[in-house]
Amino acid sequence: MKRFFRLSAALAALALLSGCASLLHPRLVEDLQLIQTIGFDGGIGDMTVSVSSGEASEDAVSAQLAARGASIQTAVQRLQDFSPREELFFAHIRYAAVGEDCARGGITPILDYFERGTQTQLSVPLFVVKGESAYTLIAANGGENEITAALSSLEADTKRQGSAHCFTVLEIASRLNRSGAARACAIAPPAPERSVPEAEDGATLALEAGYAVFRGETLCGFLDTDAALGADLLLGFAPQASYVLPDGSGGTVTVQLHTAKASLSPVRNGGEAAVRIAVRVRAGVTESSGADTADAAMLARLEEELSRAVTAQIEAAAEASRTLDADFLELWRVLPEVKGEGVLASLRTLVQTESVLERSYDIYGSAHGKEESEHG
């Protein structure tokens, strides 16, 4: 399988960057147009590159530019013709976006561009624009609703809410190299029926839309919210997600995850193989409509409900992995034969979840909600 990330090339790039000061000619800052967001559309032989310079300051002009070329590099060179400044500067790119059609055609050229570039950085988060082109998103977000600000806000929100992880170019390339599959944070404009009071004159803001899944270099599908959170729980991205649980008397109790730890182990029975997934989550009660969460029986009931919800999310992630035939859960680590053709599609997963609920100001001894299911 083609390697998506070459250590030797990365080391060479680092060597170049360590001496970049001697390679750059002195230039006035006011002559530079700093690019903060870059977008990619099209495919091999016909690439469109869109860029945004970020929020404008009092003495600077925010610019959104786009150009086509036979490759990313030629499109980038053509961008210079449209720049109001003397030179475009790409060393401060904060975000990258790929249109859905471009992602379905393959992202190897994009990963290669970031890997080899002397100005580009591998630590840049890479988003997939679901159902749209990157050009549409960047061009529609200008002025006060500039795309860089929108993506910065989205990144901060996902970290705070635990709703997604913004995978970087390096993380995506590394996972493709070792697992043949990877995820990227998916974004989408709000649907027409969804009002965004903060938006002005129909501005298109970027909303988190689960995960895009890559098998090899190509986009093969998307994960919905439940499957996305289930994958995060398994892969150690400790979320701070909230769950609204029924209290059994018509009310609800809201809890927020504190920690989530997962362990995977192989299960072999004759010629059949499965993966056992054991998850332990700790959560805190943040809101109640009236239930006595100090009551041991109520606490045990809520733990059972939380276990049921977490189990369903992990099952959704495992089912998506089978359906897409993409091992983005990295099950091969405990069951190497998963890398064999057709093995993943028929792999069974056994999910066991243990939940512990606590209150920040008074931790109670609790019965642990457990639920085990077999799915496959």
Feature-to-residue mapping (PLM):
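Membrane-proximal alpha-helical signals and transmembrane carboxylates
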Residues: 2-9, 17-376
